[in-house]
Amino acid sequence: MSIPKIVHFLWMSKEKDEKTLQCLASWKKHLVGYEIREWNSETFPYNDFIWTKEATEAKKWAFVTDYFRLWVLYNYGGIYMDADVLLQKNFDGLLDCNFFAGTEFTQQIGAHCMGSVAGHPYVKRCLDFYENRSFKTVMDNKALQEYAIPRIMTYILSIDYNVKTIRNFNNEPLKIDDGILIYSDNLFTIDICDNKNVGIHLGLGSWRDSTTFANPVYMENLEWYFIKRYYQHELQNMFSNRLKRMLYMISPIFLIVLYFKYKSRIKNIPTIMNVKNLIIKK
């Protein structure tokens, strides 16, 4: 089996901002021969599910999307992307599997860009997490961070497929049962100038509360920003990728970013125990 060339995204609010429009324009540029399917409040039956109904009432669109991305991949197959992913390549070389996703630097599944055949068992297990679960209760308990979808998907992968870690890729994706491939963060999250990046996650999500916890995607993009700006385009053509990375690693910028990465990881990386408790409790 292979993943169909259908790209799904959900837009529940009204007007799209300029950055979102730029991202969608990059999809049209690179995804020639793909169907790009925009879903909205009329085409996605959000009122049929407790989680999405209550999240919509609270106008927490990202948490509506958490359910949607699993629902649409399980029922239709294809590729799901957040609307704040800026594409640089197509997915042609990634479709010969049953499921793919990348990672975030916090060693969690990056749910902002993933593909699947319809009916995949891993997607179904993740979707089942939300069955009869109240978003309002989660929000009232101020527990939105604990219910971020990367945590849930990472935990279910670790339990159902006995995956101990999603790191140490050695330039190859992790190959897991049921045709699952997990890629490192340089494919779908950040661009580290290694010519492998498919898309950059800009991290424009509205669900984060910067006063209560750090934004790991922002930290990734901080690193990406300095890489691209620290090496002017003219200089990039003069040095090898290996040399550029070596220069970056000895620069003060690297040490600053490393510090903020550490602070973000402490606040955001889940433990097996706390996510297990979330799955057990309704």
Protein language model regions, located:
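Glycosyltransferase-associated regions of secretory-pathway enzymes
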Residues: 1-65, 83-282
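Small-residue hinge/turn detector
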Residues: 67-78
